[in-house]
């Protein structure tokens, strides 16, 4: 019988909520188009090869603060990865594309000398239809951090010429649609300071083990060359992809099979 029983409800939705149906079809078409492109162009049907997070943070024992457990934030392990990588550059410059509430900035800023955040200001957020609470939450956790400079601008249209070749670590977490990720990735590579510099992309994964094909394609198409693409990996147990300077061991772990466990102690701040 298959799913023919859904034909009636689908047709009703086409008449009663056509915009929602078209939006869903557009998203599905983009995902499948990007998936097909990645496979045909780069041969990566299984996604990026994966690095074990323990290889980047072998002595992982850290505390994540300012964690909201709300939509729009990163996973705990994403922040742990950012902090582990930031510790490589205690005197370095970090730039983040898309910071919103500033949870990641609050976690990274104590570990680096200079932090730059680029994100929409209130006017831009209202223009794209963000609710009032989201507008008020902008920079909530990055306000007052002494080494954080916030630039309220669209990363896709900003002139990065003054920052080219000056950043030790770049975190790309702004637009998650293919065109925007491609533009941000191209910009990120121009900001790399030297051969030790790192790029981290958030939401490469829809989950810990499944690629987000729009973001994935944007990363690959935005990278300058195959030599750069060879150094881009997924980090296990996170939603992140990374561009790394060093040679690392990577593989395709068996989906669903745990190779490690984590211990989590959870508290709430009294406020």
PLM feature spans:
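Alpha-helix initiation/capping motif
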Residues: 1, 37-59, 75, 121-123, ...
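Acidic/proline-rich low-complexity IDRs
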Residues: 5, 10-12, 21-24, 55, ...
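S-adenosylmethionine/decaboxylated-SAM
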Residues: 66-70, 79-271
